[in-house]
Amino acid sequence: ETGEGIITQYIILPGIQFFYNDFHMSNGQNQNKLPHADVLELNHCREGRFECRFANGTYQYIGSGDLAINLLSNQTVSTSFPLSHYHGISITIDLQKADSVIRKIDEMTGGLDIDLFSIANGFCKNGTCAVIRNQNKINHIFSELYCTKPYMHASYLKVKVLELLLYLGTEKIQNTQVKVPYFAHTQVKKVKEIQKYMVSNLRQHYTLE
């Protein structure tokens, strides 16, 4: 064991799950042993840094203020926290199940206009992952989620998740997305070896040459 972690789960609506993630450890665990191409995952990092290794040997990272959006179509091998702590929120959406619920809400409210499949296609074409970095509106939505009182969770989380989905469905925000590069295993291994060497030789002066 490398520390401790707490995941607090809430069922927002049928097909939509919400998680508060609080970790004080360096190594996480694989949470996606099998790919789920019809599940959309949103990950917002409040503090720390998150590393994810996929079965094809590539890595992806998110840091403070990042919102990662991806379909669970890639098999995850391992996860870790390079800074030994991580605090954030995850939202998983089963597109088929949640879509029917969203449509019913749309009928009752008269024009909610949330298209989950359009959001998934807009951000995750060809199974890629997208990250929105430090976007004020998104950070504002999540800042309120982090401060929600426990007695308000049952209703307030529903409202804020719907607000987030409504915002992500706009063409403007989809055009600001930043594609996250995948890092090869050899690149990551080399960087980690350099980091390990530098930490073990703190008295030595290093340059970028």
Where are these regions (language model features)?
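N-terminal accessory interaction module
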Residues: 1, 57-58
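N-terminal low-complexity or simple alpha-helical regulatory segments
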Residues: 1-37
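Short, charge-rich binding segments
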Residues: 10-11, 31-36, 43-44, 51, ...
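Glycine- and acidic-residue-biased ligand/ion/polar-headgroup-sensing regions
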Residues: 16, 36-57, 65-67, 94-95
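Short, conserved acidic/polar surface loops in the N-terminal third of protein domains
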Residues: 21, 31-34, 52-57, 103
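Residue-level recognition of well-ordered beta-strand positions that form the cores
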Residues: 22-24, 43-45, 92, 199
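Alpha-helical bundle regulatory/interaction domains
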Residues: 53, 62-184, 191
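Basic/polar phosphate-binding segments, predominantly the helix-turn-helix DNA-binding elements
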Residues: 166-174, 193, 197-209
